[in-house]
């Protein structure tokens, strides 16, 4: 029996085998170190998805997919997908609890013709437009004409099972969507009003004198004055198909795309039946005239692990990550959102959880949000 001679390599016994395991296992065992390793790569800071810290995921939009709604859209950003359906319901003024006070407020609002007749009025047209939008938003808010609702209990992620009451995240997202709908002054009240049609003019009867003609004309003039009889209430349902970060941004884009797709029937108040009727012709339907297209950009601050495991020190440092995915959101304590509108105007800023993002960093995020708005506006126009 032959005996195998010992190895002539002196380092064979002393060289330990390297311990290797998949990247997914590394991410689960030490997620912070895993993300730090990517951001401190010699090739430059790259996230596990291959994006740079300031790079957002491109969205895709498909509108008009739901036939039972007045407007719908499906939006996907990375692995996050949202379906938005908008349906209008008629709210009669008889069902408004405080309708008389709302009417008095409307009477106190000067019209455009009245405001221009003031001899010493120095208000510019832009300021008048802003005031009118604020008044429209106040009326929409008082009547509760915009009713958003977000549903995460669709199995979109392991954290949101299709059982139980709405989660805290779903309620928070609904509140943020509702707040931005009003603070951005997105809709005009004129698009939601339903007026009474004036009665057809009757043939004048022969009149014997001027007094009789004047008595017959006055009631006709009063009857011919149009009145607001009802409003459109928009019920906005947002369902998450899948969720992997940037829930607010994706939900808001789906809402904007669905609003662009809305076509409300031509509704009017019929004096004979004292009810609101809708035209069956699709050619008579109308779109919503949006005042602006506010676009959000969410971000988070990641504190990396440096030498010795000290967070925020050494080689790790701090990184501002925009459009975070689900893995990155779990590692960022300081988060926020910047919303910009037409002309780069800052509509809203939300931030909490830390003090890394100061004025300089926020200015850079606003510029990134302006660039993202141009991208999203192009996607909405194509969709």
Predicted regions and their residues:
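Polyanion-binding surfaces on beta-sheet-dominated domains and ring/shell assemblies
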Residues: 2-383
């Amino acid at each position: 029996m032959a005996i195998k001679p010992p190895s002539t390599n002196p380092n064979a016994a002393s060289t330990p085998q390297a311990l290797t395991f998949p990247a997914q296992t590394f991410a689960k065992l030490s997620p912070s170190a895993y993300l730090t390793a990517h951001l401190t790569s010699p090739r430059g800071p790259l996230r596990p998805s291959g994006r740079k810290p300031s790079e957002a995921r491109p969205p895709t939009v498909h509108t008009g997919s739901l036939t039972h709604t007045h407007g719908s859209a499906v939006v996907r950003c990375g692995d996050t997908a949202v379906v938005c359906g908008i349906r209008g319901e008629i709210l009669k003024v008889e069902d408004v609890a405080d309708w008389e006070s709302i009417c008095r407020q409307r009477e106190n609002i000067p019209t455009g013709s009245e405001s221009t007749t003031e001899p010493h009025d120095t208000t510019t047209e832009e300021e008048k437009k802003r005031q009118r939008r604020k008044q429209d938003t106040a009326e929409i808010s008082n009547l509760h004409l915009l009713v958003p609702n977000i549903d995460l209990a669709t199995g979109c992620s392991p954290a949101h099972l299709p059982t139980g009451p709405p989660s805290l995240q779903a309620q928070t997202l609904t509140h943020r969507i509702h707040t931005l709908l009003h603070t951005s002054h997105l809709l005009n009240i004129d698009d939601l009003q339903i007026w009474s049609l004036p009665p057809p003019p009757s043939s004048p009867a022969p009149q014997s004198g001027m007094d009789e003609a004047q008595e017959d004309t006055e009631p006709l003039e009063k009857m011919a004055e149009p009145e607001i009889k009802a409003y459109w209430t928009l019920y906005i349902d947002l369902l998450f198909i899948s969720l992997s970060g940037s829930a607010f941004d994706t939900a808001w884009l789906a809402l904007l795309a669905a609003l662009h797709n809305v076509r409300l029937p031509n509704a009017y108040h019929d004096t004979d039946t004292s009810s609101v009727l809708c035209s069956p012709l699709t050619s008579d339907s109308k779109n919503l005239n949006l005042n602006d297209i506010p676009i959000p950009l969410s971000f988070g601050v990641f504190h990396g692990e440096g030498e010795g495991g000290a967070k925020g020190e050494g080689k790790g440092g701090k990184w501002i990550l925009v459009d975070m995915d689900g893995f990155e959101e779990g590692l960022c304590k300081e988060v926020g959102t910047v919303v910009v509108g037409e002309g780069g105007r800052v509509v809203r800023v939300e931030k909490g959880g830390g003090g890394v993002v100061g004025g300089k960093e926020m200015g850079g995020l606003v510029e990134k949000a302006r660039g993202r708005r141009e991208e999203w506006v192009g996607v909405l126009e194509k969709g």
